[in-house]
Amino acid sequence: MGIKGLTKLLADNAPDSMKEQKFESYFGRKIAIDASMSIYSFLVVVGRTGTDMLTNDAGEVTSHLIGMFNRTIRVLEAGLKPVYVFDGKPPEMKGGELAKRLARREEAVESLATAKLEGNEADMEKYSKRTVKVTKQHNEDCRKLLRLMGVPVVEAPSEAEAECASLCKTGKVYAVASEDMDSLTFGSTRFLRHLMEPVSRKLPVMEFDMNKVLEGLSLTMDQFVDLCILCGCDYIDTIRGIGAQTALKLIRQHGSLEKILENLNKDRYQIPDPWPYEEARRLFKEPLVTQAEDVPDFKWTAPDAEGLIKFLVEENGFNHDRVQTAIKKIQLAKNKSSQGRFVNCLCRL
């Protein structure tokens, strides 16, 4: 879910914190990418015809592999240095949100069955997409693919967004790429949306600067975290009737969730019981992440051509010639990136 209404709130109140950028402007930059978010979008969009998804001869879905392979090649060809971060075990507080997602998927399954009986193709496609879930196997497939491509993979101890933000805050990467705005709540100093969108959508990358977010909203980081909790996050329910603009007004007026709750009109706003905002706040400010000293140096190595042929062509039915061509693209892209870094070094001498 991310943070409800945060993008519009920033556009209205801190417009200088966000700017459109060209994809290629991140040449040579290390970018931490939320892997699960990308895999989900590939499963929903790539190669889908109505309710049918791309599969191999064994009937196993391959949309995630095709999407990850092609999109990562595009990233590498632009000279970017991607680091894919995979989710670990979710915090217990996220159980409520995960249960809601499960309920929505189950409801979508029922609606899909009804649409099939009625022969309503538009509804069939719509509800089919809502049944999509990223599985353990999808993640394992993509981890294997990325390693064969010579791209670094990080296993987060808990939330990928938190791990990405930590890598950014400690200078291990230049920016975080995701579609969930809670990357900012976790403290990403530089956050990118639409980096992994397909070329066909022609969307520019939207870059958010955390310092300018706080400056534009006239908030401290602690107050920004409280604002995001009040807007609505994955950890606790919202207070009905309080949207993003009202949340900002209340935070500016009272300074903290404690003061807001002390002064809130209880007749007008019903506070959920329980409403463990302190624990939600702790998860944003002190998430379970890999300590900076334990993060290894990231290395982008040459692709394992033989391994890629075996995995993609022999095991998953990809076209041999296309995979061979793609491998050459990866090799050329990595050489280009290395040469670019060398030129940059010379320019600084």
Swiss-Prot record:
The gene is FEN1-B. One of its GO terms (molecular function) is 5'-3' exonuclease activity. Mg(2+) 2 binds at residues 180, 182, 234. This is Flap endonuclease 1-B. It comes from the Eukaryota. Interacts with PCNA. Three molecules of FEN1 bind to one PCNA trimer with each molecule binding to one PCNA monomer. PCNA stimulates the nuclease activity without altering cleavage specificity. Phosphorylated. Phosphorylation upon DNA damage induces relocalization to the nuclear plasma. Its EC number is 3.1.-.-.
